């Protein structure tokens, strides 16, 4: 018997992916989206629909967290190629509420987003980050159809989450090691496990700290690379789920893809002559028969 093992590959057989997540629907998202689009990158924008600004609102002098109106949000995010996700209708501390109220906060936000942006919304970022997480909160999210939710503790790693409702990012854009981590990510050539760089923050912080060059430098360095898949949070989630739904025969020589998207993987075999690797893509609805002896 030939021993075999698998490593997931992102679309177009890539090893690496990058995703971003920004909260609170502030006016500065307009500039951020321009920077992302210029560099071929994608982000998820986490919105509290109960906190839209009203039309004609005059902000106090010096205010930096200037939330957009509902109308402007639709103009900005709808059909932009970026994702909108839940952030709690009123941005509360979810751990300070009963489960029924957590569900109401999340479900109301989800309903509003789906109505305004005419898309399914299944993702979220915890308002106030880790302070809003508990097992009880996570159970309430599951009941409302949320499949992933981002936390705020930096891992400084490039791993996929083991628990999608406790999805911690690589780092925030304020991390002093941001570019060091970016360079490490780009330079890594091990080509083993899939690698994900996950950046998060609030775009109004760039104005508050007068440092738009931080995200510009990051995106210019990390963006527009052929070997990186740029995806929203939900695209990352959906792709991993599709990979995990692949159906294999017992001898691992035949695989069926029941999902709606193509899935890539690296197939390793250990034979007398040594380890042999081949990368495959199995299309939606396709059954792929793998050759017994693979080309290197």
Language-model regions, residue ranges each:
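Boundary/entry segment of secreted carbohydrate-active catalytic domains
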Residues: 1-28
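C-terminal domain-boundary segment and adjacent tail
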Residues: 2-12, 114, 148-159, 183-186, ...
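A short acidic, amphipathic alpha-helical/loop segment
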Residues: 7, 31-35, 136-140, 214-218
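Active-site metal-binding loops of divalent metal-dependent hydrolases
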Residues: 22-25, 88, 203, 233
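A Trp-anchored, charged/polar loop motif used as the substrate-binding/catalytic surface
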Residues: 26, 172-189
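Metal-dependent polysaccharide deacetylase catalytic core of the NodB/CE4 family, i.e.
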Residues: 37-137, 143-147, 152-171, 195-203
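Well-ordered, non-membrane alpha-helical segments in soluble/globular domains
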Residues: 66-71, 106, 178-184, 212-218
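Intrinsically disordered, low-complexity Pro/Gly/Ser/Thr-rich segments with frequent PxxP/GP/PP motifs
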Residues: 276-296
């Amino acid at each position: 018997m030939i021993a075999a093992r698998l490593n997931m590959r992102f679309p177009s057989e890539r090893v690496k992916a990058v995703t971003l997540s920004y909260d609170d629907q502030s006016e500065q998202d307009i500039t951020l989206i321009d920077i992302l689009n210029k560099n071929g990158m994608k982000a998820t924008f986490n919105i509290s629909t109960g906190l839209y600004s009203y039309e004609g609102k005059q902000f106090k002098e010096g205010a930096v967290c200037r939330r957009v109106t509902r109308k402007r949000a639709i103009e900005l995010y709808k059909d932009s190629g970026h994702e909108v996700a839940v952030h709690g209708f009123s941005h509360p501390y979810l751990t300070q509420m009963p489960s029924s109220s957590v569900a109401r906060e999340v479900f109301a936000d989800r309903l509003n987003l789906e109505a305004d942006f005419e898309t399914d919304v299944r993702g979220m970022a915890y308002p106030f980050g880790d302070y809003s997480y508990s097992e009880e909160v996570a159970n309430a999210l599951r009941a409302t159809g949320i499949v992933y939710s981002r936390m705020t503790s930096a891992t400084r790693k490039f791993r996929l989450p083991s628990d999608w409702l406790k999805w911690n990012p690589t780092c925030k854009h304020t991390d002093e090691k941001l570019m060091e981590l970016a360079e490490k990510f780009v330079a890594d050539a091990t080509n083993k496990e899939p690698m994900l760089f996950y950046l998060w923050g609030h775009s109004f912080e760039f104005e508050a700290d007068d440092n738009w060059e931080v995200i510009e430098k990051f995106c210019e360095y990390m963006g527009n690379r052929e070997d990186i898949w740029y995806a929203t949070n939900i695209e990352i989630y959906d792709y991993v789920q599709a990979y995990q739904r692949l159906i294999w025969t017992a001898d691992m020589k035949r695989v069926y893809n029941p999902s709606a998207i193509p899935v890539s993987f690296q197939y390793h075999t250990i034979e007398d002559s040594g380890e042999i690797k081949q990368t495959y893509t199995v299309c939606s609805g396709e059954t792929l028969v793998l050759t017994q002896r693979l080309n290197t």
